[in-house]
Swiss-Prot record:
GO molecular function list: arginine-tRNA ligase activity; ATP binding; tRNA binding
GO biological process: arginyl-tRNA aminoacylation; tRNA C3-cytosine methylation
Functional note: Involved in tRNA methylation. Facilitates the recognition and targeting of tRNA(Arg)(CCU) and tRNA(Arg)(UCU) substrates for N(3)-methylcytidine modification by METTL2.
Subunit description: Part of a complex containing tRNA(Arg) and METTL2. Interacts with tRNA(Arg)(CCU) and tRNA(Arg)(UCU). Interacts with METTL2.
Name of the protein in question: DALR anticodon-binding domain-containing protein 3
């Protein structure tokens, strides 16, 4: 029997516990062909490794068939098959449980108590936008996505640096990246005094212009060898710019902005133990960022104990030699291509139509974000130049298009209701979800609505892990939304949702609409994690 919010993870944990101690043997099915006959499978090979001759004891069958507990989905049947031990859920009960509590499956729950504080540092935002490289743009978009996901889960995030270049602020607005701005630089006087006291410059040494002094970092690197710092780091040339960067990080760590939570006990300098610094950098900035990390440790005895680095891989454009294309040029290219593709589809010059201006702006940003974020951030990214990625099923435009189709569907129901064709939407508790027996309906619920929040929570882990780099999977949301769009598009093209206005058809229509309400909420939450508003038309 299910209690509380159902979860794939909770169900798998209970299934594996029912089999007994040892390695996990169950996995969730995802392919439509397999979901026609089962929802979970314990493969024959895994059972043979666990039990003699692969014969599952009767007590295990009974335990699996009577499975229950917090978050565990209700079981219909469990039976041996040539593939292994096959399990199917009570699907109408799962539909009812999930679709009767949409918010708990589409919106992350905030923790009862505040979790760790995160300082998210993106050095690329100190650049002039006209010189911003594509690899730096990738780091900016990854950082913005991480901020949104962490805050959605109730994590207190402080972003560094505040943007001081008004042109950068304007460019970020075009990209729908939310990042604070500031007009004044942070004072470096106190830090300067501290750092100058640590300089050990010989009289014979001549420093380069603009360099205040040299600090040796070799000892720190050797002490933290296991953490993964570059062993070639020897020293750091300290400049005013470097002090300014360090001062911004110090300010963020020591004087946490108001966020509605009480300050750490012990004053503004307390709480470094619960603070995590995440440096999101391009591959070109990674070496210098390690130096800054070590410099902070050397000159500040109140430096946060955990500094993690996320290094974004290089970005190349097919047909463009080297890395000559800048981020603004890339944005203009994609915007022009979106306008051209829409003009070919709808006819006329819609780019000059004020009603379409915002739509094209959103579509071009969606195209960019899905291109930049659909690949694991650490890997190399190759972008197309002459051909736009707005066509096909793996583009941001495809996702936005299907989100708009959902909006059109519900607008169509509303219009039909106003005309008296359809009754008002009944209470969800009165709906008969046993009428949802199309395989596409279960695919949408089981592969998308049910596991969505679990997937979202796996984007980044703040658990204390060894090493310099933080495990993140910022590609997961984009890939999930693309797959959801493909499943929804297939279902929508095949099934007529708004049927004829006949009373005996309303039950199935409302059950389907409630399912698609859940799909719509998942779409909206997923797009919000990317800073993209849903469109009502394309």
């Amino acid at each position: 029997m299910a209690t509380g919010r159902l979860g794939v993870g909770e169900t798998l944990q209970a299934l594996n516990a029912a089999v007994g101690p040892g390695s996990p043997v169950w996995f969730k099915e995802t392919h439509a062909r397999h979901l026609r006959v089962r929802d979970f499978l314990a493969p024959r090979s895994a059972l043979q490794a666990r039990f003699r001759d692969g014969q599952v004891p009767e007590c295990v069958f009974r335990a699996v068939s009577c499975l229950q507990g917090p978050g565990v989905a209700p079981v219909l049947r469990c039976a041996p098959t040539p593939a292994g031990l096959s399990l199917q859920l009570q699907r109408p009960a799962v539909f009812e449980h999930v679709l009767g509590a949409l918010a708990s499956y589409a919106t992350p729950a905030k923790p009862a108590s505040p979790g760790p504080r995160v300082i998210l540092h993106c050095p690329a935002l100190r650049c002039n936008p006209d010189t911003l490289r594509l690899s730096q743009l990738r780091a900016v978009l990854v950082a913005d996505h991480l901020v949104r996901v962490l805050r959605a889960h109730g994590v207190r995030v402080c972003t560094v640096p505040p943007v001081r270049d008004p042109h950068m602020s304007t460019f970020l607005q075009k990209l729908r990246v939310e990042w604070p701005s500031a007009s004044k630089n942070t004072s470096t006087e106190t830090l300067r005094t501290c750092v100058l006291a640590k300089f050990n410059v010989s009289k014979e040494e001549t420093l380069p212009p603009g360099v205040l002094g040299r600090l040796c970092l070799k000892e720190l690197v050797e002490q933290r060898h296991a953490a993964g710092y570059d062993p070639s780091i020897d020293h750091c040339l300290v400049t005013e710019d470097l002090l300014s960067v360090l001062s911004e990080l110090q300010e963020a760590a020591r004087h946490w902005p108001e966020d509605g939570h009480p300050a750490p006990v012990g004053g503004p300098d307390a709480g470094v133990d619960d603070c995590v610094v995440i440096h999101v950098v391009s591959c070109e900035e990674a070496f210098q960022q390690q130096k800054l990390d070590l410099l902070w440790q050397k000159v500040d005895d109140q430096v946060p104990h955990r500094q993690k680095h996320l290094v974004c891989g290089p970005v190349k454009v097919a047909g463009v030699p080297g890395t000559q294309m800048t981020a603004p040029e890339y944005h203009r290219l994609r915007h022009a291509q979106v306008c051209k593709a829409s003009a070919q589809k709808h006819g006329g010059d819609l780019a000059q139509d004020p009603a379409w201006t915002e739509t094209f702006d959103i579509l071009s940003v969606a195209t960019i974000k899905f291109e930049m974020l659909s690949t694991a951030p650490q890997g190399q990214l190759l972008l197309a130049h002459s051909t736009i990625s707005t066509k096909g099923t793996k583009s941001g435009t495809f996702v936005m298009y299907n989100c708009a189709r959902l909006a059109t569907l519900f607008e169509g129901y509303k219009h039909g209701m106003e005309q008296g064709l359809y009754p008002t939407f009944p209470l969800v508790s009165s709906l008969d979800f046993s009428l949802l027996h199309d395989e596409g309906e279960w695919l949408l619920l089981f592969n998308s609505v049910l596991p969505f929040l679990d997937l979202l929570s796996q984007t980044v882990s703040l658990a204390s892990t060894p090493g310099l780099h933080i495990p993140v999977r910022t590609e997961m949301v984009c890939k999930f939304l693309v797959q959801l769009s493909m499943d929804f598009s297939s279902y929508y093209n095949r099934v007529h949702i708004l049927g004829e206005p006949r009373p005996h058809l309303f039950g199935q229509m409302f059950a389907r609409l409630q399912l698609l309400r859940a799909v719509r909420e998942v779409f909206h939450t997923g797009l919000a994690m990317l800073g993209l508003p849903p469109l009502s038309h394309i």
